[in-house]
Amino acid sequence: MGTYAVDMVYACHSMQVEKCRMLDLGAGGVKLNGATAQDPASERTHHVVIADNDIGFGGRVFLAGVGVASLRASHIDIVHNHIHDLYYSGVSCGWLWGYEESTSFDNTIAYNHIHCLGHGVLSDMGGIYTLSVQPGTVIHHNLVYDIEKANYGGWAIYPDEGSSHILIENNVCFGTSSSCFHQHYGRENIVRNNIWAFGREGIVAFTRPEEHIGFTFERNILLTKGEPVYTGKGIEKIKADMNLFWDVEKKPLSYAPDLFKPEENESMDQLKARGYDLFSVVADPKFADPEHGDFTLAPDSPAFDIGFVPIDLSTVGPRVGSAD
């Protein structure tokens, strides 16, 4: 396949791409495009289901091919796909930089198995990547791991420029070459009840603070190996509390405003003294085998004390009888 296996261009609606194998791809698997808010409404793309597909071994001609790219489209369900072995992002959703009116909204990205991306070839990517104001968009129950950047930017979930009003919950993300979660800039996103583990440059990053609150971060579990739990300027522009932190090497936990200036790092006690993560806890979450990707919680895990709800990923990826 020379470019994308499926390419929908403008005014596509009420369609399904299901139970397909899309492998050995010049670019990516599925691309949707639609009209902007300034274009005629009749040209908008909406109500498309992309489900139970195996999408992999892409970018063989165009390195920046994406597993599923939803550009300027609404009511798109990207669910139960296996997306793997690409040189760039697994899922991209949005595609309008900044806070202008967007035609990307009410999208669902859920139960996808996304892994082995980047391979050290490209930079600035995410297992799941978003752009623009997207009210009603939900990212939940995805398993994302092994994101390897070239020079910078290998994140699991990456709300980029203008990403706003997105709910990110019940995802398990680990083994990234940068942080597990990174918000460049956006407003009023909610990030709750996720597991973030073993980002080589930290766990949670935020890089462009603005006057408003960027995101609310609560009831997450953050697991690290000596790396900072938070990185970036502007921690005062996020609302973080009721989280659980743990360093498997039992090193002191820290917030790093600048990764290149470790002398500026703050301890968790210093953060609490400034009013952040006041009711968060530092404790071993008692995962079954996190080093090998098993994040099952023991019955007596202290994570339950912060209100964490176990994440059921038993149906992640294509369902029985489908492409996988």
Residue ranges: model-predicted function:
Residues 12-27, 40-59, 74-88, 101-118, ...:
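Right-handed parallel beta-helix
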Residues 33-40:
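Asp-box/WD-like beta-propeller blade repeats and closely related beta-sheet repeat scaffolds
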Residues 10, 34, 72, 93-95, ...:
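Active-site proximal loops enriched in glycine and acidic residues that flank catalytic Cys/His/Asp
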Residues 7, 77, 92, 127-129, ...:
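Structured core elements
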Residues 3, 9-12, 70:
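Divalent metal-dependent phosphoesterase catalytic cores across multiple superfamilies
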Residues 210-324:
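Acidic, glycine- and Ser/Thr-rich low-complexity intrinsically disordered tracts
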